[in-house]
Amino acid sequence: VSIDSFDVLVSTHQAYIDAGADVITVNSYASSRLVLDPAGLSSEVRSINMKNIDAARLARERCGDDAVLIAGSISHALSFASEQEKSTATCIEAFDEMVSFFEEGEVDLILLEMMSIPTRMLPLFRSVSSSTLPVWCGLSAQRAAPTALITGYHDETIPLIDNIQDA
């Protein structure tokens, strides 16, 4: 979106601010190298993410409300085209890169979205813990049955609390 429809992205952020949002989220949930490389966009990872940040910053500037915070979004999602799990080292490299974009773009905080897969959560937690930016973490969980343990989305055998305690 940031490449082809930058103005639409800015307008969307502005609409959220006009509606009273205290925090706007950079359109970066699915723009890490883990998602963009398989889509053939490896040479554009930096450009896409910096434009995403610029769109949020421009919207805040146009609205004239410096109290609105900008959250840089990171997920541990892989490309839908990806058929195999990525190595921990590959994940850390991609997550560190996203953190560096957010620091360079001067976002106000990092938002971890839909955390549910322990093998990718831990490397992401490691990457964001090296940043001076505050971190907001959203967990994704489910129950297989009404009386079952709350578990991570992808592994019903591991209680969610165990994932959090490991992190």
Where are the regions that the model predicts?
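Domain-level signal for soluble alpha/beta catalytic cores
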Residues: 1-167
